Amino acid sequence: MNMTENANTADVSGYSFEKAVAELESIVARLERGDVALDESIAIYERGEALKKHCETLLNAAEKRIEKIRLDRAGKPQGVEPLDGE
């Protein structure tokens, strides 16, 4: 697969977390093999950065949605609150 500048700048905002991670893993594997020309290495590295940022955004959003269960004195579920106590 030859990554061009268009592929590098393609919007990743619609990617699922799993799709972004899979592509990021593929990029890392290619870079680790070291068989990619310098210009292409830079382009796919930049693509990887975009994917990494997208994954971080998705993880942060998921973290904000996670809730922990509050228990009353008897240990019974009483409701939920944000995980970080906000």
Curated annotation (Swiss-Prot):
It is found in: Cytoplasm. InterPro entries: Exonuc_VII_S, Exonuc_VII_ssu_sf. Its EC number is 3.1.11.6. GO terms for molecular function: exodeoxyribonuclease VII activity. One of its GO terms (cellular component) is exodeoxyribonuclease VII complex. It catalyses: Exonucleolytic cleavage in either 5'- to 3'- or 3'- to 5'-direction to yield nucleoside 5'-phosphates. Pfam families: Exonuc_VII_S (PF02609). It comes from the Bacteria. Disulfide bonds: none annotated. The keyword Aminoacyl-tRNA synthetase does not apply. GO terms for biological process: DNA catabolic process. Keywords: Cytoplasm, Exonuclease, Hydrolase, Nuclease. Heterooligomer composed of large and small subunits. PANTHER family: EXODEOXYRIBONUCLEASE 7 SMALL SUBUNIT. Bidirectionally degrades single-stranded DNA into large acid-insoluble oligonucleotides, which are then degraded further into small acid-soluble oligonucleotides. Belongs to the XseB family. This is Exodeoxyribonuclease 7 small subunit. It comes from Agrobacterium fabrum (strain C58 / ATCC 33970).
